[in-house]
Amino acid sequence: MQADKVFKALGDPTRRKLLDLLCETNGQTLGQLCENLDMARQSATQHLEILETANLVSTVRRGREKLHFINPVPLHEVYERWVRKFERQRLSLLHDLKKELEGE
């Protein structure tokens, strides 16, 4: 299941940091990403591979470089499937609480 891969990828703080870096500046090379991480290139590459497997990051070759781009679609799908329904429920509970407190 694709959502399982997304949750696994998001479960690591380094991978979340990589996604944050790509949100700030999309299309970075491995070297550019490693400048902001305290780890070896090989470790960063392994994290990027997990993000690619979850379809959260895609790469494009430009000459000898690989550029890494964030793919927001899986994050949006997780939001729609898992977060949004709880958000609606929370808003409904807050509305009911407001009505109760205001004596309506």
Predicted regions and their residues:
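Amphipathic alpha-helical dimerization/coiled-coil segments
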Residues: M1-Q2, E24, H76-E104
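Beta-hairpin "wing" of winged helix-turn-helix
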Residues: E52-G63, F69
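N-terminal helix-turn-helix DNA-binding core of bacterial DNA-binding proteins
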Residues: Q2-S43, E65-E77, R81
